[in-house]
């Protein structure tokens, strides 16, 4: 039940904190000894029951706050829980490393994939690979021992710098990929990156430099990380929190959503523009007449025009399919990115305003769930691109089957097969007239 303070008003503060932060020392609404009985004042009081919480079955909240700032919440796991959690975290780490290594190897060693637009995918894979190698193992160890940081003060700052830079680089690369896809679809002839491979490395370098701009301030005194013997937490300074979350997430997410909207709009416009109503059918009466030869000549000319129209429409259909595929791919990328990272950044933005700048008062399991959901984005990125890219799929399959020598040949054969499929549609004039009596008669005579 919700408590009532001395003035008769509902005790909203105590009610909310009893739900969000159980077992934590909370202020109590109680009149101070010399104060007016009608005025409530803050009198800190530690809640009872901490020993009971610490003695609960594993996994359980430790319930002790081991430093002055109130940081250091820990979870005591039993042996079975540690085995299950450790196995899951190890599997996530290994799959992330394997998937992103496949991307890097595929683009670097397969000639057909060495295109400027694929450099962005390599940059994304390197960022995600860095997360899996330099960040996730230390988070895994910290989580397995209940949330206590054991790697020291100096390495805490190094770890936070690596975590922020790699995750931000991954997010910003996804943003640049969305811009690249949009320009490639809407400006295929004028988009310079497609023709000039020198521009793409500059864009990638800009992404990593901007990511470093978020990493460096805590190292040079603008905002100090929360760092003691048991806690390693990024700075909770209000200004730095707003700056870092905006640059690392909210602005890139807004750009990605806008690019997806523009590609989706272009695909719908292309679908409406290139609808093919069908060819006009030639009536038999127009062929079988007294002036049959003249009529036939006119119909042959009309069929030739329709054949050219068919070629043009086939090209339009190819453009439409490419736009539709780009819209679908980018939509799934944006959706997965938002689902993975939005909870973490909402929590990171709100945390200083809820808990203050000294430490985090959010339950440890909530923070870790949101954090691992964000790390999962580094796992699924290479599989998303492989699912929508036939060349990457073929290369993955060949690498996993240790068939290294025939990769380029297989990609060339697959590309030729796709081109032949597009050219399979009939173009002969008499095929347009196949419903006419003349064509049926000609086929019967032959």
Curated annotation (Swiss-Prot):
Relay the domain remarks: Specificity for G(s) G alpha proteins is determined by the length of transmembrane regions 5 and 6 (TM5 and TM6).
MF terms in GO: G protein-coupled serotonin receptor activity
Kindly list the residue ranges recorded as spanning the membrane.
Answer: 85-109, 120-141, 154-179, 200-220, 239-261, 328-353, 365-388
- Protein name (record): 5-hydroxytryptamine receptor 7
GO BP terms, alphabetized:
adenylate cyclase-activating adrenergic receptor signaling pathway; adenylate cyclase-activating serotonin receptor signaling pathway; chemical synaptic transmission; circadian rhythm; positive regulation of MAPK cascade; smooth muscle contraction; vasoconstriction
Localization per record: Cell membrane
Q: Identify the keywords attached in UniProt to this record, alphabetized.
A: Cell membrane, Disulfide bond, G-protein coupled receptor, Glycoprotein, Lipoprotein, Membrane, Palmitate, Receptor, Transducer, Transmembrane, Transmembrane helix
Q: List the disulfide bonds.
A: 156-232
Gene Ontology cellular component annotations, sorted alphabetically: plasma membrane; synapse
Q: Which domain of life is it from?
A: Eukaryota
The residue spans the entry assigns to the Cytoplasmic side of the membrane are as follows 110-119, 180-199, 262-327, 389-446
Glycosylation positions?
5, 67
Residues annotated for serotonin binding in this entry = 163
Give the similarity note.
Answer: Belongs to the G-protein coupled receptor 1 family.
Q: Where is the lipid attached (S-palmitoyl cysteine)?
A: 402
Q: Which residues lie on this side of the membrane: Extracellular?
A: 1-84, 142-153, 221-238, 354-364
Tell me which InterPro entries the record gives: 5HT_7_rcpt, GPCR_Rhodpsn, GPCR_Rhodpsn_7TM
Q: Which organism is it from?
A: Cavia porcellus
Q: What does this protein do?
A: G-protein coupled receptor for 5-hydroxytryptamine (serotonin), a biogenic hormone that functions as a neurotransmitter, a hormone and a mitogen. Ligand binding causes a conformation change that triggers signaling via guanine nucleotide-binding proteins (G proteins) and modulates the activity of downstream effectors. HTR7 is coupled to G(s) G alpha proteins and mediates activation of adenylate cyclase activity.
């Amino acid at each position: 039940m919700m408590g009532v303070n001395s003035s008769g008003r509902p005790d909203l503060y105590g009610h909310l904190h009893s739900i969000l932060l159980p077992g934590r020392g909370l202020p109590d609404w109680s009149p101070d000894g010399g104060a007016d009985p009608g005025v409530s004042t803050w009198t800190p009081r530690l809640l009872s029951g901490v020993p009971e919480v610490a003695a609960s079955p594993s996994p359980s909240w430790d319930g002790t706050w081991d430093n002055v700032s109130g940081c250091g919440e820990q979870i005591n796991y039993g042996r079975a829980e540690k085995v299950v959690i450790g196995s899951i975290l190890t599997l996530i780490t290994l799959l992330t490393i394997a998937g992103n290594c496949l991307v890097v190897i595929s683009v670097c060693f397969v000639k057909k994939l060495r295109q400027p637009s694929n450099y962005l995918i390599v940059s994304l894979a390197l960022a995600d690979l860095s997360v899996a190698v330099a960040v996730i193992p230390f988070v895994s160890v910290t989580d397995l021992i209940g949330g206590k940081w054991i790697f020291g003060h100096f390495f805490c700052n190094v770890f936070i710098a690596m975590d922020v830079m790699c995750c931000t680089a991954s997010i910003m690369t996804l943003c640049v990929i969305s811009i690249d896809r949009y320009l490639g679809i809407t400006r295929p002839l004028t988009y310079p990156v497609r023709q000039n491979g020198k521009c793409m490395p500059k864009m990638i370098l800009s992404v990593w430099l901007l990511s470093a701009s978020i990493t460096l301030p805590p190292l040079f005194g603008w905002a100090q990380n929360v760092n003691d013997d048991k806690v390693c937490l990024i700075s909770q300074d209000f200004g730095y929190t707003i700056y870092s979350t905006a640059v690392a997430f909210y602005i890139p997410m807004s750009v990605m959503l806008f690019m997806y909207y523009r590609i989706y709009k272009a695909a719908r416009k292309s679908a409406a523009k290139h609808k093919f109503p069908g060819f006009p059918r030639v009536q038999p009466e127009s062929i079988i007449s007294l002036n049959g030869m003249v009529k036939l000549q006119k119909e042959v000319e009309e069929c030739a025009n329709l054949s050219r129209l068919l070629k043009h429409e086939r090209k339009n259909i190819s453009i439409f399919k490419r736009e539709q595929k780009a819209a679908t791919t980018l939509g799934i990328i944006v959706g997965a990115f938002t689902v993975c990272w939005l909870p973490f950044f909402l929590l990171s933005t709100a945390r200083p305003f809820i808990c203050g700048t000294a430490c985090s008062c959010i339950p440890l399991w909530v923070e870790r769930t949101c954090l691992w959901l964000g790390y999962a984005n580094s796992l699924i990125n290479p599989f998303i691109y492989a699912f929508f890219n036939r060349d990457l799929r073929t290369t993955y399959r060949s690498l996993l089957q240790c068939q290294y020598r025939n990769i380029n040949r297989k990609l060339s054969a697959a590309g030729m097969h796709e081109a032949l499929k597009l050219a399979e549609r009939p173009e002969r004039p008499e095929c347009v007239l196949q419903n006419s009596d003349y064509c049926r008669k000609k086929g019967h005579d032959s």
